[in-house]
Amino acid sequence: MAKVLVLYYSTWGHVETMAKAVAEGAKAAGAEVTLKRVPETMPEDTAKAIHAKTDQDAPVATPAELADYDAIIFGTPTRFGNMCGQMRNFLDQTGGLWAKGALIGKVGSVFASTGTQHGGQETTITSFHTTLFHHGMIVVGVPYSNPELTNMNEITGGTPYGATTLAGADGSRQPSANELAIARAQGKHVAGIAAKLAG
């Protein structure tokens, strides 16, 4: 049984919702799944001022524990076409793991949230991949065997690089059924590959 960590940061809850769907998909594939988030770096008064969702249930992860899993599926909101600062800060603390080669051969995957269709969802995921490659991880996306990726009946997130959702300019749009289906498919796909690699 593969051990899968779904590790995310979410300001307003969009990535949190996607993370739960990813975890559902991984569990459906028979994986032992852990859902955690990275620490908040935003000052508390700022978080309150922007109405950030601070009541998230997932426990906070530590960089050292990444080595305990066969696969890690990362979730991040987009910040100017890149991962958010909270996730970057967390990953910048994984130098010790890199020095030991602790993540070499583990499966890595990424999902994201953007404000709009053209808000940088693909660049966020592909630029995130650079860190995973430096750790020697096996990067996995979402195959086109999932029909939701080619859905042209609505405005929707979703890429072969990883699941995405569109939050809307004011954050009011929630992940759609189509986007959540892609997230579940990503979790299932990653868990299946991790199980095969784990033997």
Swiss-Prot record:
Its EC number is 1.6.5.2. NAD(+) binds at residue 12. Pfam families: FMN_red (PF03358). GO terms for cellular component: membrane. InterPro entries: Flavodoxin/NO_synth, Flavoprotein-like_sf, Flavoprotein_WrbA-like, FMN_Rdtase-like_dom, NQO. The keyword Nucleotide-binding applies. Binds 1 FMN per monomer. Substrate binds at residue 98. Its cofactor is FMN. It catalyses: a quinone + NADH + H(+) = a quinol + NAD(+); a quinone + NADPH + H(+) = a quinol + NADP(+). It is an enzyme of class 1 (oxidoreductase). Residues 4-190 form the Flavodoxin-like domain. It comes from the Bacteria. The keyword Membrane does not apply. FMN binds at residues 10-15, 78-80, 113-119, 134. One of its GO terms (molecular function) is NADPH dehydrogenase (quinone) activity. Keywords: Flavoprotein, FMN, NAD, NADP, Nucleotide-binding, Oxidoreductase. Belongs to the WrbA family. This is NAD(P)H dehydrogenase (quinone). It comes from Acidiphilium cryptum (strain JF-5). The lineage of its organism: Bacteria, Pseudomonadati, Pseudomonadota, Alphaproteobacteria, Acetobacterales.
